[in-house]
Structure formats: structure tokens, C-alpha cells
Amino acid sequence: MIQFTKMHGLGNDFMVVDGVTQNVFFSPEQIRRLADRNFGIGFDQLLLVEPPYDPDLDFHYRIFNADGTEVEQCGNGARCFARFVRNKGLTNKSKIRVSTSSGKMTLRLERDGTVTVNMGVPILEPSQIPFKAKKPEKTYLLQTPMQTFLCGAASMGNPHCVLDVEDVASASVAEIGAMLTKHERFPRGVNVGFMQVVDSGHIKLRVYERGAAETLACGTGACAAVVVGQVQGKLGQQVRVDLPGGTLTINWEGEGKPLWMTGPAQHVYDGQIQL
């Protein structure tokens, strides 16, 4: 039997598994079965806590989408990860350092119950996103058989393109998201953000996630949207991001500086399951 915890960050929900005290391995097929909301546990991503590979770090953090693919980063998951390792007694630290497949992160448990995550320095160089373009631009043209889209592009350890929309509530997120997530200019696929700028300190956002469709919240998507908005001169240093599942606060001092994300992490229940 495998012990697990169900958690969510603004409705972006996770199955979190302790791979430090348990010996666990998940095949893509098992993950897809567990992610099924009718026949399994149901989740957007599976988060796996592993021992650190580096003695200077506390844990290694792995993320698997509902379709069984392993991905580089998940911001909402990082907040739940921090809350999980503290709740389970795997650490007593309030500042936790972890590695992911895309780099290192610092997670900080705040006194008010929220979690602040140092998401690292955003990547704007196209080849590192990865995105096919000759040089970094504030805005790119993405052509599809149906229409051409204007977008910004950035990586928070995973690739994002961000579209400006007048009204996020009426945006064709499912249709356009499905079209762009596998666009040929993003060799590893892309998460697609739909951003409505309310003012320089406030945006509304919906995100179509690569491998998971639209979710109630996407932490890295919120970060990428603020980066793109700031690069385009539309947003300031601290931005409130309203997602369908709730609100995140993003703070970024500009290019070359790390980005900080603050938001909630909720425990739902503990369970056990036979694979």
C-alpha cells in the first residue's frame, strides 16, 4: 500500500507522495489511472518527494502531469510540497531548499499559513525556453492555419506563451490552448496563458496547461504572465494575479532577478492505495 496526501493550491490539485520513507515507482500508465477523476484519485499533477541529490539541499521535487509525462516545474505544487514535508515531519525548517529537473528552488513557510516560493530567474532567451526565434522580443507572431496570434514567451523552468485578451472570461481558452500547446515553434510543447490586464498591479489569468488542459490555477503561468507583462511595459514590480481558483501575489524586480510567488497550500485528506 502507498500512503498519499491529496492537496491543492487554488484548486490546482495534487496527489503528493513521500518517496523518502516509502519505496515508490510510478509508470505513466499507473499515473494516468490514478489521475482519472471517475476511476482513480483524480488530480492535475502527481508530486513526488525524494531525498536530495545535493547535500546542500533538503529534497528533490518531481512532477508528473495527469497524462503520465514528467515535467520540469509546478509553482502551485511547490507550495503544497513545502506544506507537505513540514506536516509529515520530514523537516522542521521554515525555509526549504529543493531541486527539480530544471534547477533549484527555495520555499518559505510564512506565519500566516501561505507559502512563498523563490521561482528563480525567468528565462527569456528563446533557445532556452525552448522557442524557435532568432532573438528575444517583447512580442512574437505565432501563425496557425486558423489565425495569427501575438504572444510573449518565457520559461519558469517550463515553457509558457502568454496572450493578451480583453476579457479573460470569454476567451476561447480550450480551443486556442489546444491549438497552441503543440505549436511547432515550441519543441517541447507550451503552457498557454490568457492575460487580461486590469491595471499595472493587477491581472486576471486563465492557463491551458501542457498535458493537463485548463486548470483552476497555474503558479508558473502566473509568474510567466507577470514577466511578459512587465517586459512589455504593462505591469509593475508587485502584481496581484486572479486565477479561477483564487489569487497569487507575484513580485519581480526585473530581468536577471529571481521572481517570488506567494499563495496558499491546502491539505484535503490523507489516504492509501494499492497500485
From Swiss-Prot:
Q: Give the record's pathway.
A: Amino-acid biosynthesis; L-lysine biosynthesis via DAP pathway; DL-2,6-diaminopimelate from LL-2,6-diaminopimelate: step 1/1
Q: Which InterPro entries match?
A: DAP_epimerase_AS, DAP_epimerase_DapF
* Could be important to modulate the pK values of the two catalytic cysteine residues (site feature) positions: H160, E209
EC number(s) on file: 5.1.1.7
Q: Which GO terms describe its cellular component?
A: cytosol
- Family classification: Belongs to the diaminopimelate epimerase family.
Q: How does the record describe its quaternary structure? A: Homodimer.
The protein's name is Diaminopimelate epimerase
Q: Could you tell me the gene encoding this protein?
A: dapF
